[in-house]
Amino acid sequence: AMNLNLPDKDKEIYSLLGSGSVGNSIRLLKYDGATIYRSILSFLNQLPNLNGFELEKFVSTFVGSKNREQLELLIELLNIAIARISKSGVLEENFLDQALNEENDIFQKLCPNPNIAKRWAELAQVQAKNLSHGLAVNLDPGSLILDTFFRIEDCAKTIR
């Protein structure tokens, strides 16, 4: 049996992102999903103005055939993050019970109400489709992910 001495804040993030699936949680652990998700959150925290240089540096670490698993995890976590932004606007106060501390302030700023949640929900749907299609037809994964972040940035700029 694996004995995992995870800090409590990581236990929370793994159970949340793993959606209760043991297999998913193990994959998240193996590829350090908590760190990847926290990085995504730190970029979301920069909105509406992303630091393009920092973002490119981050994304470049996922590109290359030996990083395929990490890349797929990054895409999955990015899709989860966008969907959770939308969910936070719909559920408002009730979202706090199921949110990570790091998410609360960021998501409240990005999605203050159910009206804006619709925009994020549409973006989540479109981007999930674009990413999976782009990978299927072998578009450059780095460009796909950067494009997704820039579309997130565009959406954030409409909220003021």
Regions found by a protein language model. Give the residues of each.
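Charged, glycine-rich active-site and insertion segments that engage polyanionic ligands
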Residues: 1-77, 82-84, 88-160
